[in-house]
Curated annotation (Swiss-Prot):
Present with 279 molecules/cell in log phase SD medium. It comes from Saccharomyces cerevisiae (strain ATCC 204508 / S288c) (Baker's yeast). It is found in: Mitochondrion inner membrane; Mitochondrion intermembrane space. Residues 10-54 form the CHCH domain. Keywords: Chaperone, Copper, Disulfide bond, Membrane, Metal-binding, Mitochondrion, Mitochondrion inner membrane, Repeat. This is COX assembly mitochondrial protein 2. Interacts with CMC1.
Length: 109
């Protein structure tokens, strides 16, 4: 059986878990000859759906967290460089200009 079934994330599959346990505990020959396979397949399907739902929820939560982090970064940059990062644009242009001048000096030598 699945070892992680006690986790809270699989409470939606509790009926399938109980049905499979009952089938396994009732008569041993049913388990041996695969007569509990319907319950097992239903449980596997339920666990897969629960897992997919958990993954979807985790992706949505991570996107929300990422958006929050990006807002914070933007706020920090606006505080540091001004609105629309005008100061940063000016500094980047000056840096590129100095780099181009140093490259031209190196090529002319």
């Amino acid at each position: 059986m699945h070892p992680q079934l006690e986790a809270e994330r699989f409470h939606s599959c509790l009926d399938f878990i109980n049905a499979l346990d009952k089938c396994h505990q009732k008569e041993y020959y049913k388990r041996i000859f695969g007569l509990c396979n319907n319950e097992k397949d239903a449980l596997n399907k339920c666990l897969k759906e629960a897992s997919l739902n958990n993954k979807k929820r985790a992706v949505i939560e991570s996107r929300i967290k990422r958006a929050d982090v990006e807002k914070r970064w933007k706020k920090i940059e606006e505080e540091e460089y001004g609105e629309d990062a005008i100061l940063k644009t000016i500094l980047d242009r000056q840096y590129a200009k100095k780099k181009q001048e140093s490259d031209n000096d190196a090529n002319s030598k």
